[in-house]
Swiss-Prot record:
One of its GO terms (molecular function) is mRNA binding. Keywords: Ribonucleoprotein, Ribosomal protein. Disulfide bonds: none annotated. Gene3D superfamilies: 2.30.30.770. It comes from the Eukaryota. One of its GO terms (cellular component) is cytosolic ribosome. It comes from Arabidopsis thaliana (Mouse-ear cress). Pfam families: Ribosomal_L27e (PF01777). Belongs to the eukaryotic ribosomal protein eL27 family. PROSITE patterns: RIBOSOMAL_L27E. GO terms for biological process: translation. PANTHER family: 60S RIBOSOMAL PROTEIN L27. InterPro entries: Ribosomal_eL27 (IPR001141), Ribosomal_eL27_CS (IPR018262), Ribosomal_eL27_KOW (IPR041991), Ribosomal_eL27_sf (IPR038655), Translation_prot_SH3-like_sf (IPR008991). This is Large ribosomal subunit protein eL27y.
Length: 135
């Protein structure tokens, strides 16, 4: 079978707390691991999307509207819907399986992921990824 859930592929989560949110695959485990015996992947996604910025907004308000909130999570392949989009953000060193094990490592990983995704948003690339799904 062809492996199409590769690194940097944009996906939409279908189940759980972040259902309907967009995420990007960081690392995939096609054959599973010893503790999770099914195909799954590590994803980083947007918990809260940036708001629409208008011209008359002040610089302070524009900065506030450009903020994003992130999540890092292990997700079963069954709970993902792949898209045709890819996101060229290097989150491999930021979010690791080790970062999910302890609270303080996860907090630092979330801050770094947030910074990288906000920087990507401000450059204006991957506009589709930073827009909320309408459904």
């Amino acid at each position: 079978m062809v492996k199409f859930l590769k690194q940097n592929k944009a996906v939409i989560l279908l189940q759980g707390r972040y259902a309907g949110k967009k995420a990007v695959i960081i690392k995939s485990f096609d054959d599973g691991t010893s503790d999770r015996r099914y195909g799954h992947c590590l994803v980083a996604g947007l918990k809260k999307y940036p708001s629409k910025v208008i011209r008359k907004d002040s610089a302070k308000k524009t900065a506030k509207k450009s903020r994003v909130k992130c999540f890092i999570k292990l997700v079963n392949y069954q709970h993902l819907m792949p898209t045709r989009y890819t996101l060229d953000v290097d989150l491999k060193e930021v979010a690791t399986l080790d970062a999910l094990k302890s609270k303080d490592k996860k907090v630092t990983a979330l801050k770094e992921a947030k910074a990288k995704l906000e920087e990507r948003f401000k450059t204006g690339k991957n506009r589709w990824f930073f827009t909320k799904l309408r459904f």
